[in-house]
Protein backbone atom coordinates (compact mmCIF):
# COMPACT_ATOMS: atom_id res chain seq x y z
CA UNK A 1 0.00 0.00 0.00
CA UNK A 2 1.27 3.46 -0.93
CA UNK A 3 1.01 6.45 1.37
CA UNK A 4 0.66 9.72 -0.55
CA UNK A 5 1.97 12.99 0.88
CA UNK A 6 1.76 16.51 -0.52
CA UNK A 7 4.41 18.76 0.99
CA UNK A 8 5.80 22.21 0.38
CA UNK A 9 9.59 22.45 0.22
CA UNK A 10 9.67 23.79 3.79
CA UNK A 11 7.66 20.80 5.01
CA UNK A 12 10.06 18.21 3.60
CA UNK A 13 12.21 16.63 6.29
CA UNK A 14 15.92 16.20 5.65
CA UNK A 15 15.33 12.45 5.19
CA UNK A 16 12.50 13.03 2.68
CA UNK A 17 14.52 15.56 0.70
CA UNK A 18 17.46 13.17 0.59
CA UNK A 19 15.21 10.34 -0.66
CA UNK A 20 13.70 12.61 -3.33
CA UNK A 21 17.08 13.75 -4.62
CA UNK A 22 18.45 10.20 -4.47
CA UNK A 23 15.52 8.79 -6.48
CA UNK A 24 15.62 11.57 -9.07
CA UNK A 25 19.39 11.21 -9.48
CA UNK A 26 19.25 7.42 -9.76
CA UNK A 27 16.75 7.63 -12.63
CA UNK A 28 17.35 10.94 -14.39
CA UNK A 29 21.15 10.99 -14.17
CA UNK A 30 22.39 7.41 -13.72
CA UNK A 31 19.73 5.21 -15.38
CA UNK A 32 19.07 7.59 -18.28
CA UNK A 33 22.78 8.37 -18.61
CA UNK A 34 22.01 12.08 -18.58
CA UNK A 35 24.93 14.04 -17.10
CA UNK A 36 22.90 17.15 -16.27
CA UNK A 37 22.28 18.59 -12.84
CA UNK A 38 18.87 17.56 -11.49
CA UNK A 39 18.75 20.12 -8.67
CA UNK A 40 17.62 23.11 -10.71
CA UNK A 41 16.79 25.64 -7.99
CA UNK A 42 13.03 25.32 -8.60
CA UNK A 43 12.18 22.89 -5.80
CA UNK A 44 11.54 25.64 -3.20
CA UNK A 45 8.60 26.93 -5.30
CA UNK A 46 7.05 23.51 -5.95
CA UNK A 47 4.56 21.24 -4.24
CA UNK A 48 6.09 17.79 -3.77
CA UNK A 49 4.14 14.53 -4.08
CA UNK A 50 5.79 11.57 -2.37
CA UNK A 51 4.51 8.01 -2.70
CA UNK A 52 6.06 5.84 -0.01
CA UNK A 53 5.69 2.42 1.59
CA UNK A 54 4.64 2.01 5.22
CA UNK A 55 8.35 1.68 5.98
CA UNK A 56 8.88 5.18 4.53
CA UNK A 57 10.68 3.91 1.43
CA UNK A 58 10.12 6.42 -1.38
CA UNK A 59 8.84 4.63 -4.51
CA UNK A 60 7.63 7.52 -6.64
CA UNK A 61 7.65 11.28 -6.81
CA UNK A 62 6.41 14.27 -8.80
CA UNK A 63 6.49 18.01 -8.30
CA UNK A 64 3.81 20.54 -9.20
CA UNK A 65 4.02 24.26 -9.83
CA UNK A 66 1.16 26.69 -9.35
CA UNK A 67 -0.40 28.19 -12.48
CA UNK A 68 1.65 30.86 -14.18
CA UNK A 69 -0.58 32.54 -15.19
CA UNK A 70 -3.23 29.99 -16.27
CA UNK A 71 -1.25 26.76 -16.58
CA UNK A 72 0.00 24.58 -13.73
CA UNK A 73 2.81 22.14 -14.46
CA UNK A 74 3.77 18.66 -13.34
CA UNK A 75 7.38 17.58 -13.58
CA UNK A 76 10.17 15.34 -12.31
CA UNK A 77 7.75 12.40 -12.51
CA UNK A 78 9.76 9.39 -11.39
CA UNK A 79 9.15 5.78 -10.32
CA UNK A 80 11.84 3.67 -8.65
CA UNK A 81 13.01 0.88 -10.97
CA UNK A 82 11.93 -1.74 -8.42
CA UNK A 83 8.36 -0.38 -8.37
CA UNK A 84 7.61 -0.22 -12.10
CA UNK A 85 5.07 -2.30 -13.98
CA UNK A 86 2.26 -2.30 -11.40
CA UNK A 87 0.39 0.87 -12.39
CA UNK A 88 2.15 3.13 -9.90
CA UNK A 89 2.92 5.71 -12.59
CA UNK A 90 -0.76 6.04 -13.41
CA UNK A 91 -1.63 6.40 -9.72
CA UNK A 92 1.08 9.02 -9.25
CA UNK A 93 -0.08 11.07 -12.21
CA UNK A 94 -3.74 10.82 -11.18
CA UNK A 95 -2.81 12.12 -7.73
CA UNK A 96 -0.99 15.05 -9.36
CA UNK A 97 -3.83 15.81 -11.79
CA UNK A 98 -6.42 15.66 -8.99
CA UNK A 99 -4.30 18.00 -6.84
CA UNK A 100 -4.10 20.55 -9.65
CA UNK A 101 -7.81 20.33 -10.44
CA UNK A 102 -8.81 20.73 -6.81
CA UNK A 103 -6.50 23.68 -6.11
CA UNK A 104 -6.79 25.44 -9.47
CA UNK A 105 -9.98 24.19 -11.18
CA UNK A 106 -9.74 26.57 -14.15
CA UNK A 107 -6.06 25.97 -14.87
CA UNK A 108 -4.68 23.79 -17.58
CA UNK A 109 -1.85 21.39 -16.73
CA UNK A 110 1.37 21.23 -18.75
CA UNK A 111 4.04 18.56 -18.83
CA UNK A 112 7.29 18.16 -20.70
CA UNK A 113 7.00 14.46 -21.52
CA UNK A 114 9.76 12.18 -22.65
CA UNK A 115 8.73 11.00 -26.11
CA UNK A 116 8.69 7.31 -25.24
CA UNK A 117 5.97 8.06 -22.64
CA UNK A 118 3.72 9.98 -25.03
CA UNK A 119 1.08 7.19 -25.21
CA UNK A 120 1.09 6.81 -21.42
CA UNK A 121 0.26 10.49 -20.94
CA UNK A 122 -2.33 10.49 -23.74
CA UNK A 123 -4.20 7.69 -21.95
CA UNK A 124 -4.38 10.00 -18.92
CA UNK A 125 -5.97 12.76 -21.02
CA UNK A 126 -2.95 14.82 -22.07
CA UNK A 127 -2.75 16.13 -25.63
CA UNK A 128 0.33 17.06 -27.64
CA UNK A 129 0.81 20.83 -27.80
CA UNK A 130 4.32 21.22 -29.26
CA UNK A 131 6.74 19.87 -31.77
CA UNK A 132 9.28 17.35 -30.43
CA UNK A 133 12.39 18.90 -28.89
CA UNK A 134 15.51 17.90 -26.99
CA UNK A 135 15.79 18.59 -23.27
CA UNK A 136 19.12 17.55 -21.77
CA UNK A 137 19.72 15.53 -24.98
CA UNK A 138 16.56 13.44 -24.40
CA UNK A 139 13.63 13.67 -26.87
CA UNK A 140 10.62 15.39 -25.27
CA UNK A 141 7.25 16.74 -26.33
CA UNK A 142 5.02 19.35 -24.72
CA UNK A 143 1.64 18.06 -23.60
CA UNK A 144 -1.35 19.71 -21.97
CA UNK A 145 -4.35 18.57 -19.93
CA UNK A 146 -7.35 20.88 -20.22
CA UNK A 147 -9.25 22.00 -17.14
CA UNK A 148 -12.67 20.54 -16.56
CA UNK A 149 -14.92 23.55 -16.18
Question: Model features per residue range: what roles?
Answer:
Residues 110-112, 122, 127-142:
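Conserved catalytic-core motifs of GNAT/GCN5-like acyltransferases
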Residues 79, 85-98:
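Conserved acetyl-CoA-binding loop-helix of GNAT-fold acetyltransferases
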Residues 50, 57-65, 70-78:
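Conserved beta-strand in the GNAT
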Residues 93, 100-113:
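Conserved GNAT acetyl-CoA-binding A-motif
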Residues 66-75, 84, 105-107, 137-139:
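A conserved beta-turn-beta hairpin within the catalytic core of GNAT-like acetyltransferases
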Residues 1-48, 52-57, 149:
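Short amphipathic alpha-helix that is part of the acyltransferase structural core
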Residues 80, 114:
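Residue-level recognition of the GNAT/N-acetyltransferase active site
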Amino acid sequence: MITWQWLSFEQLTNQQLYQVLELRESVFVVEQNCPYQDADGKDPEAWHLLGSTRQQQLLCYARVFEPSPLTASIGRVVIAASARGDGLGQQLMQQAIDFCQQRWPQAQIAISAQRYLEDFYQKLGFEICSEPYLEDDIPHIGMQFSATA
